[in-house]
């Protein structure tokens, strides 16, 4: 079956269409409802009773879908544009990736409000654990057979499920907040760790285990992040990562902001990524709108995104080396970051959170003298990377602390949804800029740095290589910056080019409406993933033909990377955990959203 197939034919790749044929052959075409979208992948609805069977087939098919990339839900109750889709009060989607096919597929399940139950997928993909917990936390959907279905982002005492459409979206819709001494005691008691709840023993045959809170304010936790460690001496027997302390409800806020006014919020997801955060969002909105941006816009966006990749990696490098005991390098990396920020501020007007990309372009054109600033940075940075590699990364103490530590292979990385440098350090050559070029990356020459041991040291070396390749990309942007407009000539470009508003009354009216109310995007779904600073980051947007998003799903790499911690570090020492945390490259805003 096909929903609204006459309205839009999705641009599937051959491998995407192949899996639809394979599914129809195995289960029968009547099993599926094919949903036309602008996601660029097959989207198929399946009956709940066939879900696990279909997911297992996709996990085991030749060239299998080895990665559960994302899993989340949608409250469908207020959605008006649903013609041809299965009746649903809520839905859950499973976004699966096959690296061998370089192909994705999305499986959806419709649920009635009276029966919000699904079988768990944790027996197929271990990383379904945290995603299912978050879906229960946000929507109240139960996953039967889940090993520990508890709150993920919200406090244990929280009432309600925030991403439901009938849940308040603004603080003014709640009673004024107060925290009495009794309530504070209640909240603290709720956070007390009980080993028995997690199947942990307090005693072994000949020893008593110690339970230690690492965080939520430990400097090596890199943010408000708590890991409960079960210890035998200094050996980690087991551990439980606990997140949510930095949760700000970013996906809920997207439902109350216009498509345009949500751009600054994207900056605050990975707050070290700057405009890199804007890119998947605006690309996804542009798919909804049918906007094709000028080539100059593509090149400007790539250049600024690579600047922020370098800024992120310099901070990572300095703090990583500091975590294992060397204090000096972090001061040098911050000095070099200042040089990069000088360029960023001159071009965008801001440093950490420029919010500079726009729907259909960028905020303004490159200023006079931008090329001189970029050239100065390109002349400075390569020799600094040489110094870091010689003085710090070849240091015998650092190598001793990190080589062979927190090691995992490609198979394990994919099972846990690991992407970015953490995946490429295992020898897996998968970088979206090469495998699935976006925003014009196919026009640039660069290499994908790889390592093969998958340990804490290799992850750092991959990041070093990425900085060199980012410099190479920026050099090409500098030498080959095309002429042309910095915004697309399209009715949904927001805001429209300023020059046009001064000449044409219709453009001025459009500007007024789009900035005050927001542009109206066609009803559909769109998706865009990018190779961000910490791994693959994506925005999956659902438009119901309004000025605001009906549903915004933000998939971040750090969420998946922290879930992997127990499988990697159990059996190691506390000192190895510190080196491992430093090698991951995460910020809690990226985890908690």
From Swiss-Prot:
Purpose: NDH-1 shuttles electrons from NADH, via FMN and iron-sulfur (Fe-S) centers, to quinones in the respiratory chain. The immediate electron acceptor for the enzyme in this species is believed to be ubiquinone. Couples the redox reaction to proton translocation (for every two electrons transferred, four hydrogen ions are translocated across the cytoplasmic membrane), and thus conserves the redox energy in a proton gradient.
Chain residue ranges for the region called NADH dehydrogenase I subunit C: 1-184
Protein family membership: In the N-terminal section; belongs to the complex I 30 kDa subunit family. In the C-terminal section; belongs to the complex I 49 kDa subunit family.
Entry EC no(s): 7.1.1.-
Primary enzyme class: translocase
Subcellular location: Cell inner membrane
Reaction equation(s) it catalyzes: a quinone + NADH + 5 H(+)(in) = a quinol + NAD(+) + 4 H(+)(out)
UniProtKB keywords: Cell inner membrane, Cell membrane, Membrane, Multifunctional enzyme, NAD, Quinone, Translocase, Transport, Ubiquinone
Bilayer topology: Peripheral membrane protein
NCBIfam families named among the record's database cross-references: NuoC_fam (TIGR01961), NuoD (TIGR01962), PRK06075.1 (NF004739), PRK11742.1 (NF008728)
Keyword set includes ATP-binding: no
Domain of life: Bacteria
Sequence segments annotated as region (NADH dehydrogenase I subunit D): 208-593
InterPro entries xref list: NADH_DH_suC, NADH_DH_suCD, NADH_Q_OxRdtase_suD, NADH_quin_OxRdtase_su_C/D-like, NADH_UbQ_OxRdtase_30kDa_su, NADH_UbQ_OxRdtase_49kDa_CS, NDH1_su_D/H, NiFe-Hase_large
Protein name per UniProt: NADH-quinone oxidoreductase subunit C/D
Entry GO MF terms: NAD binding; NADH dehydrogenase (ubiquinone) activity; NADH:ubiquinone reductase (non-electrogenic) activity; quinone binding
GO CC list: NADH dehydrogenase complex; plasma membrane
Subunit structure: NDH-1 is composed of 13 different subunits. Subunits NuoB, CD, E, F, and G constitute the peripheral sector of the complex.
